[in-house]
A protein has these predicted regions:
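Basic, Lys/Arg- and aromatic-enriched nucleic-acid-binding interface segment
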Residues: 1-37, 41
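Active-site/catalytic core of tyrosine-dependent DNA strand-transfer enzymes
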Residues: 1-4, 79-140
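Short, basic (Lys/Arg/His-rich) helix/loop patches that form interaction surfaces
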Residues: 5-16, 95, 125-169, 173
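Short, contiguous acidic/charged loop-to-helix segments that flank catalytic cores in large enzymes
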Residues: 11-16, 62-77, 110-120, 140-148, ...
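Conserved tyrosine-mediated DNA breakage-rejoining catalytic core shared by Y-recombinases
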Residues: 42-88
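Short, polar N-cap/turn motifs at the start of nucleic acid-interacting alpha helices
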Residues: 47-56, 162-185
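Catalytic-site neighborhood detector that most strongly recognizes the C-terminal catalytic loop/helix
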Residues: 61-65, 171-209
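Short, low-complexity, charged amphipathic interaction modules
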Residues: 207-229
């Protein structure tokens, strides 16, 4: 739906644009390691983004409760679907600028930033629920929220067989240190992070199948006969 933009015709053009933006933010929360709206509002095109040639974000999680670790670092690999979303709704990359500036609206006080974050959370939830019910015709009992994104990120990667250590570190759950350690980066280099996060949308399986089919197509008749003997 985000790609086709086939929203209900009775919606106004203005509401379609707002709903499209909110759906993009919702999907970005899921693909950005389940981060929350406070993280989305503070996400920037920092030096790490440019060091990786625009292939990953690196940020410190915003503390949202007494139980969460303030300052836990997270690295988000920018897989193709996330890149598509960014191209649609994010601000153009400029060093140290906000990726989603419309969330905080340039607020200079923490009180105002919290207010705008809560407002955006509410807008996204309301519009995504409306999309589910009116555009996708899902059951009325289905009411997605930002919490769904975080839980789904962990659950879907776990079901896909991804290491729990990777999932935990990706969500900023490190208990020993608030920083991404060099060991983690060496153990899960960016290409591995890309592979793992691609499993959020079953992209890796499709990619492997396409590679296999391409190899088979390039083989000669003799090679194929040897393969199936």
């Amino acid at each position: 739906l985000f790609v086709s933009k086939k929203y209900p015709e009775h919606w106004s053009e203005e509401y379609m644009q707002r709903a499209h933006y909110s759906l993009g933010l919702f999907l970005a929360q899921y693909l950005c390691n389940g981060f929350n709206m406070a993280d989305a509002g503070r996400l920037t095109y920092n030096s790490y983004y440019y060091q990786t040639n625009g292939k990953a974000f690196r940020f410190n999680r915003k503390k949202t409760s007494r139980r969460s670790a303030d300052g836990s670092e997270v690295i988000v690999p920018i897989i193709p679907p996330l890149r598509y979303i960014l191209d649609e709704i994010a601000a153009p990359p400029t060093r140290d600028s906000f990726v989603f500036p419309d969330i905080l609206k340039g607020a200079e006080t923490e009180e105002l930033r919290r207010k705008y974050t809560m407002q955006e959370n509410s807008n996204v939830k309301d519009r995504v629920i409306k999309i589910c019910h009116e555009a996708l015709n899902w059951d009325k009992s289905i009411c997605p929220s930002g919490t769904w994104c975080r839980h789904s990120f962990a659950t879907n990667l776990h079901n896909a067989g991804v290491d729990m250590d990777y999932i935990s570190e990706s969500m900023g759950h490190s208990t020993s240190d608030h920083a991404i350690t060099q060991i983690y980066i060496e153990y899960y280099p960016l290409d591995i992070q890309m592979q793992n996060n691609s499993k959020l949308l079953n992209l890796e399986d499709s990619s492997e199948r396409d590679v296999l089919l391409a190899k088979l197509a390039s083989m000669s008749t003799e090679e194929l006969l040897k393969l199936f003997k």
